[in-house]
């Protein structure tokens, strides 16, 4: 039997506000436990929440970016459940009247095709605290620094059909919230977390299968692995005569498996009701019109512009527009050197390799856009060859200065004097007289391979400084003379 996978994702994006959603407590990551929790966060009697206007602004920006309906009136609700790190015994969230309604996001897949994923809603809510188990013997500690941190929960339609599509969608959301400046997207710190709802059904069946939810997956790689494992688990279970149970599961990356955590709750299990401490939020059209003017160029728009303005391939444009910082870096390099394709190649290949090796983000690059753009200029004006440029790039990464300073200090300037190159080539050909005779006696196919030998000897003799184009042209003339 052929099976079809149905996936819906719930992404929790921690909003980049300076204070919590209902109190003035700071939201900085990594503070000592319970040093960023106020009386409101601790749910002390008599305290009342005050809504953070910046969180509302950020949610509205997101709604505008996904072309969603933004309700004029939205209401906060209490989601009731007990957990040790939830001081109030309920979470303030939104249920029937979320701030952001139906929208969509277009994603680009590995084969270059585009798919539109529907977004059901996005609502504001507060985060819970954190239970600490490993530092205590026979008990657990509670850190309430995170309690009350503003979250935007983004709920997709069940439009995703594979683990790879799921990763592409999460990457698109990740890029979007960073472009908007509403979330730093740091998955290692929990700023962006994903719950994956997975079910399978016989291909062609309209009715959905029973879904399982995989909670709090916090990396692109783990999202793909967790979903693929869950798909396989459900198919094997059904084919063996069993039934999929609606439940919440956890992904264990060490064992590459999902395991049952608890039965999956429905909305009525949480006994939602409007929060009596918070008035409905009214969002006027004039407010949204002003916000729309603040929208930056979004990832899809930037990618399309990179293709049309700079003539980049769809793949290159996609990589370079993946983050706002990467796009800004590339455009600065391009502005300096005036060659978009050379700039794209150096940013994606050499710089990308350096950043990956050292585990750095583009904003932490040891080579500035000004330095890289200046170096590419020296390739274009034939001051250095592409091969020497790699040496210059490495020196810049080691903090040895600008391209011009390094070229001067190390004597790396390319030899472009035809007379000097001809003299050097004569010496190379004299030293390899036997190979010269073999070349002249060979057919065209063999000559192509042998020519590379002479080029290599010439570049070796010049220590890589001879202009490669001149070497090729002059060498060909001499060998065919």
Curated annotation (Swiss-Prot):
Its EC number is 6.3.5.-. One of its GO terms (biological process) is glutaminyl-tRNAGln biosynthesis via transamidation. Gene3D superfamilies: 1.10.10.410, GatB domain, N-terminal subdomain. It holds the Pfam family GatB_N. It catalyses: L-glutamyl-tRNA(Gln) + L-glutamine + ATP + H2O = L-glutaminyl-tRNA(Gln) + L-glutamate + ADP + phosphate + H(+); L-aspartyl-tRNA(Asn) + L-glutamine + ATP + H2O = L-asparaginyl-tRNA(Asn) + L-glutamate + ADP + phosphate + 2 H(+). GO terms for molecular function: asparaginyl-tRNA synthase (glutamine-hydrolyzing) activity; ATP binding; glutaminyl-tRNA synthase (glutamine-hydrolyzing) activity. It comes from the Bacteria. Keywords: ATP-binding, Ligase, Nucleotide-binding, Protein biosynthesis. SMART domains: GatB_Yqey. Heterotrimer of A, B and C subunits. Belongs to the GatB/GatE family. GatB subfamily. Allows the formation of correctly charged Asn-tRNA(Asn) or Gln-tRNA(Gln) through the transamidation of misacylated Asp-tRNA(Asn) or Glu-tRNA(Gln) in organisms which lack either or both of asparaginyl-tRNA or glutaminyl-tRNA synthetases. The reaction takes place in the presence of glutamine and ATP through an activated phospho-Asp-tRNA(Asn) or phospho-Glu-tRNA(Gln). This is Aspartyl/glutamyl-tRNA(Asn/Gln) amidotransferase subunit B.
């Amino acid at each position: 039997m052929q099976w079809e996978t149905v996936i819906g994702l719930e992404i929790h994006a921690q909003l980049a506000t300076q204070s919590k959603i209902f109190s003035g407590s700071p939201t900085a990551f990594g503070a000592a436990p319970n040093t960023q929790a106020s009386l409101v966060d601790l749910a002390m009697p008599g305290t009342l929440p005050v809504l953070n206007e910046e969180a509302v602004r950020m949610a509205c920006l997101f709604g505008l970016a996904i072309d969603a309906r933004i309700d004029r009136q939205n209401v906060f609700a209490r989601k009731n459940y007990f957990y040790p790190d939830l001081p109030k015994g309920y979470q303030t969230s939104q249920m029937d009247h979320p701030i952001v309604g139906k929208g969509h996001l277009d994603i680009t897949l590995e084969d270059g095709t585009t798919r539109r994923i529907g977004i059901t809603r996005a609502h504001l809510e507060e985060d819970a605290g954190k239970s600490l188990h490993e530092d205590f013997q026979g008990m657990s500690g509670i850190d309430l620094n995170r309690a009350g941190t503003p979250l935007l929960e983004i709920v997709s339609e069940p439009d995703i059909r594979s683990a790879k599509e799921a990763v592409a969608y999460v990457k698109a959301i990740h890029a979007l919230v960073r472009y908007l400046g509403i979330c730093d997207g740091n998955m290692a710190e929990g700023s962006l977390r994903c719950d994956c709802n997975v079910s399978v059904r016989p291909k062609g069946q309209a009715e959905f299968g029973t879904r399982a939810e995989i909670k709090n997956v916090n990396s692109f790689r783990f999202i793909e692995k967790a979903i693929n494992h869950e798909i396989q688990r459900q198919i094997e279970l059904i084919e063996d005569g069993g039934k999929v149970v609606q439940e919440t599961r956890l992904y264990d990356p060490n064992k590459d498996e999902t395991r049952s955590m608890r039965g999956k709750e429905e909305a009525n299990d949480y006994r939602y009701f409007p929060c009596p401490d918070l008035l409905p939020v009214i969002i006027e059209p004039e407010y949204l019109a002003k916000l729309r003017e603040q929208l930056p160029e979004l990832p899809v728009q930037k990618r399309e512009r990179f293709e049309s303005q700079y003539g980049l391939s769809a793949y290159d444009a996609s990589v370079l527009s993946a983050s706002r910082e990467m796009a800004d870096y590339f455009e600065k390099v391009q502005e300096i050197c005036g060659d978009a394709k050379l700039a794209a190649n150096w940013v994606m290949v050499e710089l990308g390799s350096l950043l990956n090796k050292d585990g750095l983000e583009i904003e932490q690059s040891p080579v500035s856009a000004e330095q890289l753009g200046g170096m590419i200029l020296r390739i274009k004006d034939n001051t250095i060859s592409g091969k020497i440029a790699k040496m210059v790039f490495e020196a810049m990464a080691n903090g040895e200065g600008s391209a011009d300073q390094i070229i001067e200090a190390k004597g790396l300037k390319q030899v472009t004097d035809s007379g000097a190159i001809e003299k050097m080539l004569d010496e190379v050909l004299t030293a390899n007289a036997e190979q010269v005779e073999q070349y002249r006696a060979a057919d065209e196919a063999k000559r192509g391979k042998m020519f590379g030998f002479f080029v290599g000897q010439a570049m070796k003799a010049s220590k890589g400084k001879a202009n490669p184009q001149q070497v090729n042209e002059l060498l060909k003339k001499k060998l065919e003379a």
